[in-house]
Amino acid sequence: MTDLKNDRYLRALLRQPVDITPVWMMRQAGRYLPEYKATRAQAGDFMSLCKNAELACEVTLQPLRRYALDAAILFSDILTIPDAMGLGLYFEAGEGPRFHSPITSHADVVKLPVPDPEQELGYVMNAVRTIRKNLAGEVPLIGFSGSPWTLATYMVEGGSSKAFTVIKKMMFAEPKTLHLLLDKLADSVILYLNAQIRAGAQAVMVFDTWGGALSGRDYKEFSLHYMHKIVDSLQRENEGRRVPVTLFTKGGGQWLEAMAETGCDALGLDWTSDIADARRRVGDKVALQGNMDPSMLYADPARIEQEVASILAGFGQGNGHVFNLGHGIHQDVPPEHAGVFVEAVHRLSRAYHA
């Protein structure tokens, strides 16, 4: 495999010295870019885009052609695992992801298979290999998965949810059923992420988008426990380098200490966390990723720069910070504003690494 020309993202995740703070954006390959919309139209629909390795590679690389980003992230979806389990993922216009066969009973969970990542999810591994080859060592490639809890919310609710009443009914009325589902999902995520690492992903991230919907006790039992199991079972070295693992729970700022105990290398922060406070609490154990409000990219360039400066000052001198948004970039953000953001992070962060 080609040597990395820019490894500052990997170094920052391991709290090693860097010259400037690395930056990438969640959903950096996406609908805010006109070239993405053109490629998606060529593919026909979202899942066809995910399943075509050449087109998935193209959209992964598109933001790197525009911006001096320090990492690429695999273009895929968190719901590939439930789809591979046979739930029948589809996308309803204006409603987001849905499943033809949601989980409604203990029997449904018992019969769920654990997918083979090189078979049912082989298209994802083909995309990883294709992207890695085309990156030619410019920047590292991030692989990812949804967390067991977050995947379970979609599988039990049948799609997106605001109140999570269906899965919480299962959690409180049939906890054994939910634990069986989460255990199967954790096993599936372990196989899936390890296959991505073998295929060429140089870092991995677990997205726990809906962990913040839980109470502290329930979060530890139904979400964090299973992410801990995943971290314990991941291949942490490949091609002679450590493969860093980042955990991100949206709305999880109150649980950073518990998250840091999992043995992960970094924690993602959403914009509701104060990065200075987070560093005081867990900065001796993990790197931190984040955490500008994605809506700040609607502001004028001077305001975006001001916010970047504020977050850099909050983290302070030294290593262990990967700059990012606190969640995915919005689809109607002007692409030039994303450019202002990336350039400002690099220019303003140099003083913090002197």
Swiss-Prot record:
EC supergroup of this enzyme: lyase
PROSITE patterns given in the database record: UROD_1 (PS00906), UROD_2 (PS00907)
Binding site for substrate: R27, Q28, A29, G30, R31, D77, Y154, T209, H327
Cellular compartment(s): Cytoplasm
Signal peptide positions on this chain: none
The keyword Lyase is annotated on this UniProt entry: yes
InterPro entries linked to this entry: UROD/MetE-like_sf, Uroporphyrinogen_deCO2ase_HemE, Uroporphyrinogen_deCOase
Gene Ontology biological process: protoporphyrinogen IX biosynthetic process from glutamate
EC number(s) from the headed UniProt entry: 4.1.1.37
Keywords: Cytoplasm, Decarboxylase, Lyase, Porphyrin biosynthesis
GO molecular function: uroporphyrinogen decarboxylase activity
Gene Ontology CC terms: cytosol
Pfam families: URO-D (PF01208)
Functional description taken from the UniProt entry: Catalyzes the decarboxylation of four acetate groups of uroporphyrinogen-III to yield coproporphyrinogen-III.
Family assignment from sequence similarity: Belongs to the uroporphyrinogen decarboxylase family.
Protein's recorded name: Uroporphyrinogen decarboxylase
